[in-house]
UniProtKB/Swiss-Prot annotation:
Primary location: endoplasmic reticulum
Annotated region (Disordered), positions in chain: 639-661
PTM note: AMPylated by fic-1.
UniProt signal peptide: 1-17
PROSITE patterns registered for this protein in UniProt: ER_TARGET, HSP70_1, HSP70_2, HSP70_3
Record function comment: Probably plays a role in facilitating the assembly of multimeric protein complexes inside the ER.
Organism per entry: Caenorhabditis elegans
Protein's name in the database: Heat shock 70 kDa protein C
Length: 661
């Protein structure tokens, strides 16, 4: 196994070089001109540009630096409104005002979170081939829009805001996504950019962008930064090291369906129940009333960040009746405490994955409007034993700021040459080997782009074909992970089991696309597959479920893996002996007939036992191997003693073992 270990070291040391070269190559080869940075948020979006050595966050036509991610169609002509204008008319036109497109993008219609959200939205969501689309009235016609199209409309607005400020057309953008977005969601976001007439030169992770905003001017050596990003609809935690312009992500975790919208919803449900209890009337029957309540609840939530209680007052809310209730900060916290506490689990996971202790974290950077909630700040401070989070950056603008810097890096703006961004892949990737074992090639939280190779062999004599099955996930057995693809390497020349050397190479490019190559080292015969962003990629819920399952079933997994490994060890040992006895150049030519027969019978007995004991436990398999060793080792020891220990070494366990395909 020494060769494989060295190979791992070479692959790992190549990672950083590969990443930096990617950046440099991109700069040299393509002239993009101005590249804007866009934070495409669930509830609000923001745009910035890097010029003349600094970032400018650009205000919209209302003078606001953040723009609601809302689209509406109003009036007899179906006029399209985007941003503030769309949000401002929500209560009079709820059925034709679309928001939260980010909670639909890249997801299936039957996704649990989509089905839960549909119950709360005033607009109609329909099923088109298991993909959600929004149906609204445009003038006198019913029209359907995909989440990509709705997001594209918001991106068009952000593009126009930038063009108005710059006084020229903008064609290129860096767009941010939650770190825990899967490939389908990332690809859908890129597609939205294309629909908006933008070339999305890079998709980057929101917490990474925020770290750039925080660390751009920090020149005080290596620092460990935890970015806690709680926005309107998504939640991410990333651990990074920042060292003089090099931003390296160590680990990332999160929940793509947790944010301010969920906190608002809890308060709305509380008031709807309260109103029904007092008046006997159900607010949900009137979409306008619900949206009026939504608007006022959001205002109340914001007010409670700076005061301990606030009044929620709505004139003529339902059936001409006014609504007036007090909401205290304590009640708001009580309604949402489980959601607030749920943010700490990913923080703990990121610390574990980074192999860092709480005391190793130099700075905690809070990003996203929901981090203004005092209880959220308090929980983080308590978790880190009283450490105060940094307040140096604007939580609403930090992500767009970092995206604008990355745009400057790619377009070759001055003063950005020292900035290098090293991000990670969120899940482990590997292949299936004998016994259904998941053999990992690239671990989760590995810096991308990256490349890793490992040598495997065959599981049967004269095997003409091996099937390379590629999986993604954290469980030890492939049946519990997600299959990304498979392909065959054919035309292997006849050879005993364990002799062919098949090198499998995994390469993840800067866009997170996986390329897998298998090569027979003996013949040079090659085959490869590219795993692209198809609809079969995992949803963030799947990712979270896998990691949670892995924790829950760790004990069961260990038993199954131990059993598979014990079986592989016994099989390899038995077949290795069999091959050596049949080889006149090895043991076969050195043993007398009696000893040879003893070993042959012991080996055949072990192989036969394996065949008839498919469900044997790890302990039974280990016992069987010990039994075989007890019969073989005295004979082999005697042979080498007689030869004065001058010959070749006895066949040791693992001497020539490779994982078998």
């Amino acid at each position: 196994m020494k060769t494989l270990f060295l190979l791992g070291l070479i692959a790992l040391s190549a990672v950083s070089v590969y990443c930096e070269e990617e950046e440099k190559t991109e700069k040299k080869e393509t002239k993009y001109g101005t590249i804007i940075g866009i934070d495409l948020g669930t509830t609000y979006s923001c745009v910035g540009v890097y010029k003349n050595g600094r970032v400018e966050i650009i205000a919209n036509d209302q003078g606001n630096r953040i723009t609601p991610s809302y689209v509406a169609f109003s009036g007899d002509q179906g006029d399209r409104l985007i941003g503030d204008a769309a949000k401002n008319q929500l209560t009079i036109n709820p059925e034709n005002t679309i928001f939260d497109a980010k909670r639909l993008i890249g997801r299936d219609y039957n996704d649990k979170t989509v089905q839960a959200d549909i119950k709360h939205w005033p607009f109609k969501v329909i099923d088109k081939s298991n993909k959600p689309s929004v149906e609204v009235k445009v003038g006198s016609d019913n029209k359907q829009f995909t989440p990509e199209e709705v997001s594209a409309m918001v991106l068009v607005k952000m593009k126009e805001i930038a063009e108005s400020y710059l006084g020229k057309e903008v064609k290129n953008a860096v767009v941010t996504v939650p770190a825990y977005f899967n490939d389908a969601q990332r690809q859908a976001t890129k597609d939205a950019g294309t629909i908006a007439g933008l070339n999305v030169v890079r998709i980057i992770n929101e917490p990474t962008a925020a770290a750039i905003a925080y660390g751009l001017d920090k020149k005080d050596g290596e620092r460990n930064i935890l970015v806690f990003d709680l926005g309107g609809g998504t939640f991410d935690v990333s651990m990074l090291t920042i060292d003089n312009g090099v931003f390296e992500v160590l680990a990332t975790n999160g929940d793509t369906h947790l944010g301010g919208e969920d906190f608002d919803q809890r308060v709305m449900e509380y008031f709807i129940k309260l109103y029904k209890k007092k008046s006997g009337k159900d607010l949900r029957k009137d979409k306008r009333a619900v949206q009026k309540l939504r608007r006022e609840v959001e205002k109340a939530k914001r007010a409670l960040s700076t005061q301990h209680q606030t009044k929620v007052e709505i004139e003529s809310l339902f059936d001409g009746e006014d609504f007036s209730e007090t909401l205290t900060r304590a009640k708001f916290e009580e309604l949402n405490m489980d959601l607030f506490r749920a943010t700490l689990k990913p923080v703990q996971k990121v610390l574990e994955d980074s192999d860092l202790k709480k005391d190793d974290v130099h700075e905690i950077v809070l990003v996203g409007g929901s981090t203004r909630i005092p209880k959220v700040q308090q929980l983080i401070k308590e978790f880190f034993n009283g450490k105060e989070p940094s307040r140096g950056i604007n939580p609403d603008e930090a992500v767009a700021y970092g995206a604008a810097v990355q745009g400057g890096v790619i377009s070759g703006e001055e003063d950005t040459g020292e900035i290098v961004l090293l991000d990670v892949n969120p899940l482990t990737m590997g292949i299936e080997t004998v016994g259904g074992v998941m053999t990992k090639l690239i671990g989760r939280n590995t810096v991308i782009p990256t490349k890793k190779s490992q040598v495997f062999s065959t599981a049967a004599d004269n095997q003409p074909t091996v099937t390379i099955q590629v999986f993604e996930g954290e469980r030890p057995m492939t049946k519990d992970n997600h299959q990304l693809g498979k392909f065959d390497l054919t035309g292997l020349p006849p050879a005993p089991r364990g002799v062919p050397q098949i090198e499998v190479t995994f390469e993840i490019d800067v866009n997170g696309i996986l390329h897998v190559t298998a090569e027979d080292k003996g013949t040079g015969n090659k085959n490869k597959i590219t795993i692209t962003n198809d609809q079969n990629r995992l949803s963030p819920e799947d990712i979270e479920r896998m990691i949670n399952d892995a924790e829950k079933f760790a004990e069961d997994d260990k038993k199954v893996k131990d059993k598979a490994e014990a079986r592989n060890e016994l099989e390899s040992y038995a077949y290795n002996l069999k091959n050596q006895i049949e080889d006149k150049e090895k043991l076969g030519g050195k043993l007398d007939e009696d000893d040879k027969k003893t070993i042959e019978e012991a080996v055949e007995e072990a192989i036969s036992w394996l065949g008839s004991n498919a469900e044997a436990s790890a302990e039974e398999l280990k016992e069987q191997k010990k039994d075989l060793e007890s019969k073989v080792q005295p004979i082999v020891s005697k042979l080498y003693k007689d030869a004065g220990a001058g010959g070749e070494e006895a066949p040791e366990e693992g001497s020539d073992d490779k994982d078998e395909l």
